[in-house]
């Protein structure tokens, strides 16, 4: 089974928070994990923000980054091609998604994902509308 992770779910693999158990289970059960190229800079930014906000103590920052890098190495990366970009534009218009969420949805469809794991209500709704199974990592 191909499971697509958006950044909100991927970060739950690195930082223990509500939804982490669900995200870890989805990762473990997947035959293949896919994500778009944008996930990496988004995840790095998310780690930095967690550090600034005090959700990630400074003493764990290095280990968290190493965990992120190790997980990223196991991801089948979906590149943002012209086709994916255009599909993302369509998804943004059709489903009222923000730009990056639309890219994640288009990338999941492009990867022929069986399920999308995320913690964003609008993206979960749009994925269901596109016929994808979803794993709700909000809690």
Language model regions located:
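Acidic catalytic patch
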Residues: 39, 63-94
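Anionic, Ser/Thr-rich low-complexity intrinsically disordered regions
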Residues: 25, 58-60, 67-70, 80, ...
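Short beta-strand scaffold positions
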Residues: 34-35, 79, 99, 118
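Alpha-helix capping/helix-boundary segments
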Residues: 9-10, 39, 84, 104, ...
């Amino acid at each position: 089974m191909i499971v697509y992770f958006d950044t909100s779910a991927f970060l739950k693999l690195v930082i223990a928070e509500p939804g982490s158990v669900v995200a870890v289970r989805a990762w473990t059960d997947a035959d293949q994990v896919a994500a778009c190229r944008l996930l990496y800079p988004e995840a790095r930014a998310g780690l930095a923000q967690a550090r600034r906000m005090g959700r990630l103590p400074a003493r764990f920052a290095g280990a968290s980054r190493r965990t992120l890098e190790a997980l990223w190495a196991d991801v089948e990366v979906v590149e943002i091609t012209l086709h994916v970009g255009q599909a993302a534009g369509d998804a943004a218009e059709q489903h009222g998604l923000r730009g990056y969420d639309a890219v994640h949805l288009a990338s999941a469809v492009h990867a022929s994902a069986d399920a999308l794991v995320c913690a964003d209500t609008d993206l979960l709704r749009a994925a269901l509308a596109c016929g994808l199974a979803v794993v709700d990592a909000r809690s």
